[in-house]
Amino acid sequence: MKTSTYTIPISKNNIRKRFILLNGKILIFLMTAITIFVLGSCAKKIVFPVSPTEPAAQGTILFKTDKNKNYAIDLTVKHLANPERLTPARKCYVVWIETAQNGVINLGQLHISKNMGGSLKTNSPYKPNTIFITAEDDPTIKEPGMYTVLRSESFNLK
């Protein structure tokens, strides 16, 4: 039985096109990988330890320094109960930073969604050493109350 073979003619022009296309895909992949690595290495991630008052609560903080030497803070929490369900009940959660030079500073209110998660993105000119969340009745207070929900360990940002 005779089998026929059919060969596809490959021209030099076709080989060049495939080579350029392959190199372009490799270049795009490498540029994407480098960008992800560079952007990821510029930020510092802090994870809150387990809280004795809210053991199910989990939280992470991502810090970046911008060109003006301000600290971009991206805080995310999940499994955090509505503050009205606490004992004693509170109205809101407030995020604080401790700094070496400026003491404790109120960063703002942390809003909790129906699925028990929340986030706060803000900037601070002050270098934080610790970040913590308290349950409060007034989000604009100047000093934290006694009910600390989550507290990071001390850290050192560059």
What are these regions (language model features)?
Residues 1-42:
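Sec-dependent bacterial lipoprotein signal peptides
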